[in-house]
Amino acid sequence: MVDDSTRKTLSSIPLLQIRAGPREKDIWVQRLKEEYQALIKACTYVENNKQSGSDWFRLESNKEGTKWFGKCWYMHNLLKYEFDVEFDIPVTYPTTAPEIALPELDGKTAKMYRGGKICLTDHFKPLWARNVPKFGIAHAMALGLAPWLAVEVPDLIEKGVIAYKDNC
């Protein structure tokens, strides 16, 4: 069952049509175009968030679209906690969701695998599996990483595991 917040997020991100991964070179280019369009439209979602002061990630990829990297951040008690984010597109994509990593948090929470990969198995991966090939990178960020940050970062801050770094 999907809650109202998830439904609202889903409605702001376009669903994808093309079922292709990095192995299908010709079709992969079309899927990448769809991914970028979804991210741009999700950026309308992000653009709306920017206007309200709650945008939270920036991404870019290598030329092939198989390695993604950037920054994500989480606001807690009016302080901005910023993290590097990275992931590779699996060769079995879109059947397999990307494993999003926050390398600097590696080993700091039980809800993380080696290399800083966040645990999405209980909540996000079943949702992804039901929505192949309609879900893409924008969905992984909004429905996978965002809720993880919302739960884990405040907990890590309260435990003193991560501290605010003034980037000025």
From Swiss-Prot:
Keywords: Ubl conjugation pathway. It comes from the Eukaryota. Disulfide bonds: none annotated. InterPro entries: UBQ-conjugating_enzyme/RWD, Ufc1. This is Ubiquitin-fold modifier-conjugating enzyme 1. Belongs to the ubiquitin-conjugating enzyme family. UFC1 subfamily. One of its GO terms (cellular component) is cytoplasm. The active site is at C119. The lineage of its organism: Eukaryota, Metazoa, Ecdysozoa, Arthropoda, Hexapoda. Gene3D superfamilies: Ubiquitin Conjugating Enzyme. It comes from Drosophila grimshawi (Hawaiian fruit fly). The keyword Calcium does not apply. The keyword Transferase does not apply. E2-like enzyme which forms an intermediate with UFM1 via a thioester linkage. GO terms for biological process: protein K69-linked ufmylation.
